[in-house]
């Protein structure tokens, strides 16, 4: 009897020990570290979480600093990135990774013709965000900027005149960008979204 009880206790203990510890939930404003962990690992900070999906384990993080003011690419050149001719269609674009990959796959000298994309550290999974991703970023800007400040990053400025490129293309002549108020624009009467215009570039990555 004692042996059976001991065997059962050992089995229960083994099961408890063998169960993996649940990963802590990720929140907007958490720090992304170099080892791809989030929260407060104490490692090297590389980004700030600005969106978390339904699993509470995965989402998107924005880089700590801008890459400068760069042009998107040449005007009147068709790219493999799908055209988004309406604001609704542009906001539905959540795949900056795919957009960036398509541009970087072109045979042209990328650094000359597509500076905003060349600035991305794509080999380490950083990419130019799509319009839908920029909108998510702007909606959580207070939390994101607080965390950026805490780790010595550059806050995302809402100073009038600041404009941020997305990887979402409007047409052969222009691409979408976000202004300092979080509004999205392409080429129109008021805002000139021609691809050769210089705008702020900030990378994001998925985790």
Predicted regions, residues:
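Bacterial N-terminal signal peptides that target proteins for export
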Residues: 1-10
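An exposed tryptophan-centered "aromatic clamp" motif
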Residues: 100-127, 131-188, 192, 206
């Amino acid at each position: 009897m004692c042996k059976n009880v001991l065997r059962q206790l050992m089995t229960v203990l083994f099961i408890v020990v063998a169960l993996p510890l649940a990963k802590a939930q990720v929140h907007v404003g958490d720090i992304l570290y170099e080892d791809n962990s989030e929260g407060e690992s104490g490692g090297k900070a590389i980004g700030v979480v600005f969106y978390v999906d339904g699993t509470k384990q995965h989402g998107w993080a924005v880089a700590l600093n801008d890459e400068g003011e760069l042009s998107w690419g040449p005007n009147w050149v068709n790219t493999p990135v799908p055209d988004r001719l309406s604001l609704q269609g542009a906001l539905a674009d959540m795949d900056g990774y795919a957009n960036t990959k398509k541009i970087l796959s072109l045979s042209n000298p990328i650094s000359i013709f597509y500076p905003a994309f060349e600035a991305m550290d794509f080999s380490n999974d950083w990419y130019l965000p799509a319009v839908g991703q920029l909108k998510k970023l702007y909606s959580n800007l207070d939390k994101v900027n607080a965390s950026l400040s805490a780790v010595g990053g550059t806050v995302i400025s809402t100073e009038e005149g600041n404009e941020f490129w997305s990887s979402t293309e409007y047409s052969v002549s222009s691409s979408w960008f976000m202004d300092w108020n979080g509004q999205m624009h392409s080429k129109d009467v008021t805002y000139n979204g021609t691809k050769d215009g210089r705008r702020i570039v900030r990378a994001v990555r998925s985790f």
